[in-house]
Amino acid sequence: FSHPVAVAEILAEQQLDDATIVTALLHDTIEDTTSSKDEITKQFTPEIADLVDGVTKLTNMQLTSTETKEAENVRKLLMAIAQDVRVILVKLADRLHNMQTIKSMKPEKQLQKARETMEIYAPLAGRMGMQSIRQDLEDLAFRVLNFEGRASIIKRFVVLQKENGDVIQRITDDMHSELEASGIRATICLLYTSDAADDWSSV
């Protein structure tokens, strides 16, 4: 039961509607229990039953290939099957928690899930505007696909951050001064993106 709760928590953090959260809690019900769509309709609502059924259909899809040239077609197929965008959102949260617990899988299964995640689910999350989930998916997949490369990039990033920290601070201070001089009140934040994972996905 911990997996559905974790998926629901991920979606709650995204401030999604109640029906989506309930769907997250029930998303494995049709697949893993004897409960049917009709029973979910009776116990909850037709809306939630449709969403759970949609997630089940996506889960049952066989992603036999994640070659880059075919990944876009797979993403389009997922979007076409999911008549309600919330089905995709639940599936993305489901995949995120699967990746967070991926160490429990056999090595070959880890590689399969990581490739699917990098080629299909992470770009799909970006397309849906869920950038934080996209970055988390990319990072978790990158750990599996190229653990040593990821560690090397992080090490280099830390060095560059130390070397350029003063320069970055001066730039942000100058920007802040210019904004204040123009009568604009603003807060400047630095955002570090997962470009390493983006690069890996095109290798």
Which sequence ranges carry the predicted segments?
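Single conserved hydrophobic/aromatic residue that forms the stacking wall/gate
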Residues: 192-203
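Active-site helical microenvironments for divalent-metal-assisted chemistry
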Residues: 1-191
